[in-house]
Regions:
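Mg2+-dependent prenyl diphosphate-binding active-site environment of isoprenoid biosynthetic enzymes
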Residues: 24-26, 33-261
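Mobile late-domain/C-terminal helix-loop "cap" segments
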Residues: 264-308
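Hydrophobic alpha-helix feature that most strongly marks membrane-spanning transmembrane helices
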Residues: 220, 230, 255-258, 270, ...
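N-terminal amphipathic/basic leader segments beginning at the initiator methionine
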Residues: 1-33
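Long amphipathic alpha-helical segments
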Residues: 100, 170, 228, 263-264, ...
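Generic structural signal for well-ordered, non-transmembrane alpha-helical segments
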Residues: 185, 213-220, 298, 302, ...
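Surface-exposed helix-capping loop/turn segments at secondary-structure junctions
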Residues: 140, 308-317
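Short, amphipathic C-terminal "tail helix"
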Residues: 3-4, 8, 313-338
Length: 338
């Protein structure tokens, strides 16, 4: 297979990947832009619009940081980081269609600007390109389990998403945790697991998985609080409530209710009417549910910090910026809680 099929020049990744010069982000975005649909492609404009706001790119940063810490092949790392980041963005585009969200990263979501058909096609294109990038990472590094590993994580993510739609009744806390872990953790795990495979560090995978499951649920709790308060960037406060989507605050609120009022709430959740949505939103914000979820969020944060402290030093270096980001999100939630 010709070298031109891969990255044309092996670039050295700078040692301070989270420094203010943004070197990792620059290298990654330069590469990512090179593999997006070209100007003549019917999806080019939609792809450019979606990536005009880069987002946090946490999964790509995890992969590139792990690659540097573990001494993995740089070319393989860029291919793998791109695969995971493309899959994450495909899920965002498809989620926005499912959820009816018109805003993504302070811009119009792809479906809102270009229609559902283009958004579906762009998400599908990203999934296809992600597996091509994973195959290239596998070829460069002779790590031929990579594509299977990526496929397994994608299946886990989809299963978590499907659980959200599969519940005839609003989920209890156990079902909610299963949904949350399934939707959030797999692609974080994939980001570093693939690099561990490339670098021959597969002994890290079990503990990495434990960390990211805990971290992912903590982050989801924080996001759920922000959704109810209207500080998550969605077009309207409590969009999860209006869509009857799983949300930790709603789960805890439902548990607080006595049977007669819970039956009324369940009846409303089972319907599709937006009547009384504002009433139930007010009831939720006036209850102790937000504060209970915030307390659980901090317990999860502490647990994640405990797990991260048991990892080898080079792995702690990879996770530290993610842990800092998680703490920042929790602090933002604390500041916005009534």
């Amino acid at each position: 297979m010709p070298d031109s099929y891969f990255i044309s020049e092996k670039q050295h990744l700078p040692s301070d990947k989270y420094s203010s010069d943004g070197s990792h982000s620059f290298i990654f975005n330069k590469f990512l832009n090179s593999i997006l649909p070209p100007n003549t492609h019917p999806l080019s404009e939609a792809a450019t619009h979606h990536f005009s706001s880069e987002g946090k790119q946490l999964r790509a940063k995890i992969a590139l940081s792990a690659g540097e810490k573990f001494g993995a092949d740089t070319t393989a790392c860029l291919h793998w980081a791109s695969a995971v980041e493309l899959l994450h963005n495909a899920s965002l585009i498809h989620d926005d269609i499912c959820d009816g969200d018109t805003i993504r990263r302070n811009n119009a979501s792809v479906w809102a600007k270009y229609g559902r058909d283009i958004a579906l096609a762009l998400g599908d294109w990203m999934i296809a390109e992600a597996f091509e990038q994973a195959a290239k990472a596998a070829y460069v590094s002779n790590s031929f389990n990579l594509v299977t590993k990526l496929s397994n994580h994608v299946k886990s993510t989809i299963a978590g998403q499907a659980l959200e739609f599969d519940n005839a009744l609003y989920p209890d806390i156990d079902k909610y945790l299963e949904i949350s872990a399934g939707k959030t953790a797999p692609l974080f795990v994939a980001a570093i697991e693939g690099i561990a495979e490339i670098a021959g560090r597969s002994e890290l995978i079990e503990e990495i998985n434990h960390y990211f499951v805990t971290m992912g649920v903590c982050y989801q709790f924080a996001n759920d609080i922000q959704n109810i308060l209207g500080t998550d960037g969605a077009a309207s406060p409590s969009s999860d409530l209006k869509r009857r989507a799983p949300n930790a605050v709603i789960v805890y609120f439902r548990n607080f209710l006595k049977t007669p009022e819970r039956n009324l709430f369940d009846s409303w959740l089972a319907g599709k009417s937006q009547n009384k949505a504002n009433f139930w939103q007010r009831k939720i914000t006036e209850s102790g549910a937000i504060h209970e979820v915030a307390k659980e969020m901090h317990k999860l944060l502490k647990r994640a910090e405990g797990v991260s402290g048991t990892l080898p030093n080079d792995c702690i270096g990879v996770i530290a910026p993610i842990q800092k980001q998680l703490r920042n999100v929790c602090e933002q939630v604390d500041a916005s809680c009534p």
